[in-house]
């Protein structure tokens, strides 16, 4: 009798244990709430250790952005969008589809719709500007404006679009911001659709530039160029005489050139027009191109569209493929790691006769130019 009861009790216990196991394995864990999803996703972006990616990472952003606690779903999506933008391939490249073909034009553009500002200084008029007038500026003088700090009769004979800025000739952040302020005001007065800034050591491929800008409506907020840093710049913003706060943002380096749509430029007015650009630059105590990024990204919340079609002397220009020169918007020359830095291109001119390679590039793009030798340009 006792043995029979013991067996029944044992079978009942085993059955109960099996039922519990079935319930536990069949019932999934509770779904995390949206805020918890946000925290987990941001931790996965930051890495298992919770640290931000290193400088060499494609998703290099301000570490404080990735590891701080997220308190709302909207905040999470804002941070995640920024991190994904850093991890994605450079858009421009951003103006191109995955198959390598240009995006369909958003509007029809002509050269008269674009305002190209070339920043220079008196001492470089002969050494740099003469080369630009001989090459790319010769194609569209009417859309190109020279912003300089000194009068020059010889320069005035080249073009009527010379703007004397009354700014210092020094290469200081104040002098650079002074010239940018004049550039901005002249663009607004012009009524043109696009503002593009370049330096006097840039070659501008006008066909590629128009093709790129036509991909975006000029009435929308568009800020396109190439950053020289692999993460947002961190600055100190002066709020009042005794108060400052940290601020971080992306900016397109002026040495590669950048473009801004008229729709966005008009929104920049409170911080850029009528001399306000200088006072805005003093708030962060950084040069002109950084100040543009500060106004656009930090104050207006418009993200930089990063394009691999802009190039400065700060990068290794030897890596620009000759077969893709016709697609590049800007090129440059100078020194890189104590070596001569220019696009590697075979052409009718030797390196000694054409150290910048701008003449060879121009003949490659425009072989019908009268002074280009009638030889095969590789």
Curated annotation (Swiss-Prot):
It holds the Pfam family Fringe. Its EC number is 2.4.1.222. The lineage of its organism: Eukaryota, Metazoa, Chordata, Craniata, Vertebrata. Disulfide bonds join 167-178, 196-259, 363-372. One of its GO terms (biological process) is T cell differentiation. The active site is at 289. Its cofactor is Mn(2+); Co(2+). The chain crosses the membrane at residues 9-29. It comes from Rattus norvegicus. PANTHER family: FRINGE-RELATED. This is Beta-1,3-N-acetylglucosaminyltransferase lunatic fringe. It catalyses: 3-O-(alpha-L-fucosyl)-L-threonyl-[EGF-like domain protein] + UDP-N-acetyl-alpha-D-glucosamine = 3-O-(N-acetyl-beta-D-glucosaminyl-(1->3)-alpha-L-fucosyl)-L-threonyl-[EGF-like domain protein] + UDP + H(+); 3-O-(alpha-L-fucosyl)-L-seryl-[EGF-like domain protein] + UDP-N-acetyl-alpha-D-glucosamine = 3-O-(N-acetyl-beta-D-glucosaminyl-(1->3)-alpha-L-fucosyl)-L-seryl-[EGF-like domain protein] + UDP + H(+). The keyword Ribonucleoprotein does not apply. It comes from the Eukaryota.
């Amino acid at each position: 009798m006792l043995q029979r009861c013991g067996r029944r009790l044992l079978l009942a216990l085993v059955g109960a244990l099996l039922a519990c196991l079935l319930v536990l394995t069949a019932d999934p864990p509770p779904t995390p709430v949206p805020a918890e999803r946000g925290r987990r996703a941001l931790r996965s972006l930051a890495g298992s250790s919770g640290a931000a990616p290193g400088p060499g990472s494609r998703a290099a952003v301000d570490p404080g952005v990735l590891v701080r606690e997220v308190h709302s779903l909207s905040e999470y999506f804002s941070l995640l969008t920024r991190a994904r933008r850093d991890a994605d391939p450079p858009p421009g490249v951003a103006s191109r589809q995955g198959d390598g073909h240009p995006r369909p034009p958003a509007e029809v553009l002509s050269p008269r719709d674009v305002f190209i500002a070339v920043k220079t200084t008196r001492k470089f008029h002969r050494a740099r500007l003469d080369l630009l007038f001989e090459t790319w500026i010769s194609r569209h003088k009417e859309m190109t404006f020279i912003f300089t700090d000194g009068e020059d009769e010889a320069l005035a004979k080249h073009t009527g679009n010379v703007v004397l800025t009354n700014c210092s000739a020094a290469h200081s952040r104040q002098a650079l911001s002074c010239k940018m302020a004049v550039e901005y005001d002249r663009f607004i007065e012009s009524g043109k659709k696009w503002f593009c800034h370049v330096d006097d050591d840039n070659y501008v491929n006008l066909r590629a530039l128009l093709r790129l800008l036509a991909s975006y409506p000029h009435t929308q907020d568009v800020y396109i160029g190439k950053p020289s840093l692999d993460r947002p710049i961190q600055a100190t913003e002066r709020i009042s005489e005794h108060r400052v706060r940290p601020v971080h943002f992306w900016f397109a380096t002026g040495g590669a050139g950048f473009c801004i749509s008229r729709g966005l430029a008009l929104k920049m007015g409170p911080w850029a027009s009528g001399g306000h650009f200088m006072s805005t630059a003093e708030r962060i105590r950084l040069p002109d191109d950084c100040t543009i990024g500060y106004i656009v990204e930090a104050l207006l919340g418009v993200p930089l569209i990063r394009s691999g079609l802009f190039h400065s002397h700060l990068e290794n220009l030897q890596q620009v493929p000759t077969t893709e020169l016709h697609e590049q918007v800007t090129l440059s020359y100078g020194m890189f790691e104590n070596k001569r830095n220019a696009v590697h291109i075979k052409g009718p001119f030797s390196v000694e006769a054409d150290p910048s390679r701008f003449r060879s590039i121009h003949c490659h793009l425009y072989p019908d130019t009268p002074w280009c030798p009638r030889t095969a340009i590789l």
